[in-house]
Amino acid sequence: MAYLERASPTLKETLLKIYRAEKPIEVDQHFHEFGSIEYHIKYSVSDPNIVHVSTSTLLETQGAVTLKEISSYTYEVIKNIGVGVIDIVDPPRLGFQLTLGLNLDNIPRGKEAIKIITRISELQAIILSSQLKEMLRSLNFQDDSRSINNMPIRIVYHPSEPFYVFKQPEKITAVFPMNFKDNSDVVIATSFFQELVEVGSQKDMGKAPQCSWSPIPPLQLRGEPVQDLTTNSGFVSFDITSRHIEGKRLDKTVWNLLNFYACAKYHIKCSRGYIQRRMRKRMETLVKLLNNTSLEEEAAQNENGRCKYVKEFVKVPKGKLMMKQRCKEMTRRVKISKFRIKINGCARFRFNQRWISLPKFSSKPSDKSYTKLD
């Protein structure tokens, strides 16, 4: 998949290293970028004036339009990067899509050299953009009466990031199935896409392609591979009209489509990092407050000594004090009543509303007590 920076970092670094070397160095480097873009750089001491750069893209398309080779228009754009500097090698290196021969002697010195090398490092961005441009042009000028032209085109620039383009009346729709590994990223992405749709519907964004999000795939994608239609973050669609692919707008539209996956993932990762930083900062603030509170309590204990514990022992909470008073009052009433017991069953004996007192027993003998006779 294309990325936010047009220039390949590894390709640019290697070419600058070869260009700035005081003596020719042997270079035979083979590397991949983003899983689908392949490069090979060959520089030999025996031929110090020529650097061979080969590149290839995993371009898979299914549908009404299929591009397997680089067009003549793309060749002209590549040659115009540096007139007299770039030669296209025919046939290309085995297993690659394009091979360029760079003449180091024809590269101008100073800042212009860095500019040309940077443009050469944008080779894959130029190829990918040109291929997608031709697809959009071919779809735009097709006849709507032919039903086969409305079939979706599956475009794969990265094995795990395919997207679809299909023709509709007066517009072209690009659909991006979105998948994320982390559950937190899924939550952030879902909220982000819904917010994107809401912002895109405002009047200020009337010139931009209309954006829509749905948790289920569009009807036009029926019959496509199940792995593409199984997502955890839904499907994002952009409606591209004829005004978006006219003149210089075509370059911007194509580049935005190629970089949508990269932009979305970049935004979500940044949002996740921001949330984590805020949570960490909040946690540090709470811990600091707790530490300050414990330090203040220890300082107060050291100043007051034992007085604090005496005050705490004497001080009684208001609720407990009221309960204690009620208990005292109840005890006083019980003592006054002399343990009188009310018997409701004696009402028929005219003892209604009367009280029977329990006799008092004493362990000391009295004068009225009985004496056992011998």
Curated annotation (Swiss-Prot):
A Pfam family of this chain: P34-Arc
Coiled-coil intervals in this record? Answer: none
Report a single Gene Ontology molecular function: actin binding
One GO cellular component term, please give it: cell projection
InterPro entries from the UniProt entry: ARPC2, ARPC2/4
Q: According to the UniProt entry, where is the signal peptide?
A: none
What subcellular locations does the record give?
Cytoplasm, Cytoskeleton; Cell projection
State the Gene Ontology BP annotations: actin filament organization; actin filament polymerization; Arp2/3 complex-mediated actin nucleation
- Where does the entry say this protein is expressed, by tissue? Expressed at low levels in all tissues with a relatively highest expression in inflorescences.
Q: Which UniProt keywords apply?
A: Actin-binding, Cell projection, Cytoplasm, Cytoskeleton
Q: Which residue ranges traverse the bilayer?
A: none
Gene3D superfamilies in the record:
3.30.1460.20
**What does the subunit comment say?**
Component of the Arp2/3 complex composed of ARP2, ARP3, ARPC1/p41-ARC, ARPC2/p34-ARC, ARPC3/p21-ARC, ARPC4/p20-ARC and ARPC5/p16-ARC.
Q: Which family does it belong to?
A: Belongs to the ARPC2 family.
Q: What does this protein do?
A: Functions as actin-binding component of the Arp2/3 complex which is involved in regulation of actin polymerization and together with an activating nucleation-promoting factor (NPF) mediates the formation of branched actin networks. Seems to contact the mother actin filament. Arp2/3 complex plays a critical role in the control of cell morphogenesis via the modulation of cell polarity development.
Q: What is this protein called?
A: Actin-related protein 2/3 complex subunit 2B
The protein's organism comes out as: Arabidopsis thaliana (Mouse-ear cress)
